[in-house]
Amino acid sequence: MGVAITSTGISREGDTFSIVEHSGRAARRSLERAGVAPEQVGVLINAGIFRDSNTVEPAVSALIQKEAGIGLDYRFGDPRSFSFDLMNGATGVLNAVQVAQSILETAGSGHVLIVSGDTHPSLARSAADDEFPYATAGAALLLEHTDEPVGFGRVHTVAGSGSPAVQSYVDVTMMGTAGRGLMTVEREPGFEDRLLEIAAEAGRRALDADEIDPVATVLIASTPTPKFPQLLAETLGIGAVRTPDLSAGDPHTASLPLAYHRAVEEDSLIGFDTVLFVAAGAGPSAAAAVYRLPVAAGAAA
């Protein structure tokens, strides 16, 4: 018994820089691929961080829920659905999985939809650069409870000590009247090594707790640098790595679902028993979870 990925959806087209539109589009595609109606989604969780025009209110999840066409009618007897933002940087998707497990395992909802993705608040570009190292992309994971011995194991989290390694903020002393389109991102010297250390600790905890053989496991990790997943795999003794398309830069909160979606599309999970999801980012903090694949790996997604 566990919580499994029913389907995935992504959006990376260049016709918009809006993360609300990209995330809503990814959500709709995941529902269409699974043949699941919007009213069957009880909860939508948005794990994205950087949003259109630095929107604070309303919750961006509500805007994405509307864009996805979920729970738009308020008639007597209609199925209830709600949404909320869960903002914890690069680890947000796995934290959302943690919440989804509690909801689905208690039959609180038939499906939980996790969306993630980031954009520059100026809505003027989609590719990463030195000042804002994150690429615009939207991704969705549709989850459901299953009686089969597949799906996510426990999500393990690790909090580091010292300075945050990576941080972002709007500099109110410099923004003037342009604050809604500005974002400052700072990466400390040696941030990759610090994130690697804490990610490895989280990954080992997940592997050891579930007694997983690294040889039969694929690593899907966050991408604070292009080589980070491979470095982490070497540290953990895992030979297989799957990554998202990094041609435009780091997709940040969308990295894990984008990589899983790509691996399923390319049938590159066949022959493996498990995926180890690991994310690490600001804090520094890290999260990891083992995902037991169905026999036909990824066929449902």
Segments predicted by a language model, with ranges:
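Conserved "HGTGT" condensation-loop signature of ketosynthase/thiolase-family condensing enzymes
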Residues: 1-49, 53-56, 62-72, 141, ...
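Acyl-thioester C-C bond-transforming condensing/cleaving domain
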Residues: 54-182, 263-301
